[in-house]
């Protein structure tokens, strides 16, 4: 992989890494809420999704480490917003679905296009593949929310 130094892809990978890392922790917190409310299956699915997010974060982090290897250790600053939402299980499922939708529908396709334009086809492919997974996560969270409400 060529160097990520000075690229927008570097910034996008770091944003994605931070976002996936935070989603993992949010879902772990949401699992505890679901468990306390008696939604054992939903708690399990939140934890399963948290593990998926860990794998996504790891993939993005590995791209960063490989593309910045000449500069390691290094500090890369980013400016980005991340969701903060905590409520009951229905509210948490709604927030989780919204976060997943933003990733697959907006962020990752945009990040993939930038990576492709900057000559990082493997990074672009990873963004698109992970976007597919995030879409399935959104669908699952919506269905679980609807099951509780109905």
Q: Where in the sequence are the language-model features?
A:
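Non-heme di-metal
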Residues: 1-150
């Amino acid at each position: 992989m060529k160097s990520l130094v000075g690229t927008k892809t570097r910034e996008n990978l770091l944003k994605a890494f931070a976002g996936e890392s935070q989603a993992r922790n949010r879902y772990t917190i949401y699992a505890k809420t679901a468990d306390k409310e008696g939604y054992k299956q939903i708690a399990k699915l939140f934890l399963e999704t948290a593990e998926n997010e860990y794998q996504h974060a790891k993939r993005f982090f590995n791209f960063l480490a490989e593309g910045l290897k000449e500069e390691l250790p290094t500090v890369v600053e980013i400016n980005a917003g991340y969701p903060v939402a905590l409520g009951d299980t229905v509210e948490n499922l709604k927030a989780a679905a919204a976060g997943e939708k933003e990733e697959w529908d907006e962020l990752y396709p945009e990040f993939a296009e930038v990576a492709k334009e900057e000559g990082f086809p493997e990074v672009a492919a990873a963004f698109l593949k992970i976007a597919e997974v995030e879409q399935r996560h959104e669908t699952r969270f919506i269905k679980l929310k609807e099951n509780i409400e109905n």
